C-alpha cells in the first residue's frame, strides 16, 4: 500500500503492518455525533410530562421535515423499516402483487413488502452509482406489478426523471427508500420528494440520529388521513386530538409506529445542528476522496461516483475493490473498521 487511510488527526498516520487492528486504533465504522443540546431537550420533554409519541418535539421534527421536503405530511416512526411497512399498507400490497426493488440494498427494502405477501422482483443496479438501473426497470413490469421502490444509495440520487416517467406510463407507485439521502438532491429537488411515499432513517449510523428512528414522507395528500390511522394502531386518534371527532375509534388495520417524544427531542437537536454536522461530514468525505485517489489507482479500486445532477449529503464513503480475495486483509491492515466479516 502506498498511502495510509486518512484519520481524524491533521497529519496522516502511516500504519504499522506488523500490528493488529486493535493496536492500530482502527478508524471506527461509525461515530455518532452529539450536538450538546440533546440532553437539554430530553429534560424539557420529561419536565413537560409527555414522553409518549406525538408530543411537542415530535410535532416540531415533523414540521421541520415537511418544510424541508415540501411534503403535505411527514410522520415520525420507530424506524425506517416501519415506515416502509406503512408504505406497503398504504398501497394495499397483497399476496401475489409484485414490487420492483434494487438487487443491492438492505433487507428492509424488500422485506416490508414480502411481509404482506408480495413477490420482490429484483432489478440490477448501475455500475457507477450502485443505484437501481433505470434502463432495466421497464422489462420487469408485468400485470401484477404494483410499485417501484428506489434506494438512493449513499445518498446519491437515482435517475428519478426516467423512473418517474416509467411509473407514470404504467400506472405504478414510486416509493423512495431514502434512508441514506436526507438533504440530498437530484436536479435541485430534494430526495424524498419524488415518490408518492418516501422513507427516512434516523438510526445511529445516519447523518441525523436519535439512536433508532425513521419517518414516512407522504407526498400524496390523498394518503395522509389513512397514514395517520395506520400509525395510530388503526384508530383516528390523531383526528381526535385535533378536535375533528368527539372520540377515537378503530377504523382500519394498523400498528404502533410512534416513537417516544424523548427520541424526537434528541432528534430535534440534531436537526438544529444540521450545518455543523454536514460541514464536518463534507470535510471528512473530501479528505477520504483526495487521500485515497492515488491508493485506489494503485490497487485497482474505485471511489464513489457522483453524477452532475446529484447533490450528495455526504452520508457514506465506500470503495469498490477489484475482487473479494484478500479484501478483508487489506482493510484490516489499513486500520479501518468495516461491516465486512
Language model segments and positions:
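Structural detector of well-ordered beta-strand residues that form the stable sheet scaffold
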Residues: 75, 100, 121, 173-175, ...
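PLP-dependent aminotransferase-like
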Residues: 89-178, 185
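Short beta-strand-to-turn element immediately C-terminal to the catalytic PLP-Schiff-base lysine
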Residues: 200-201, 214-220, 268
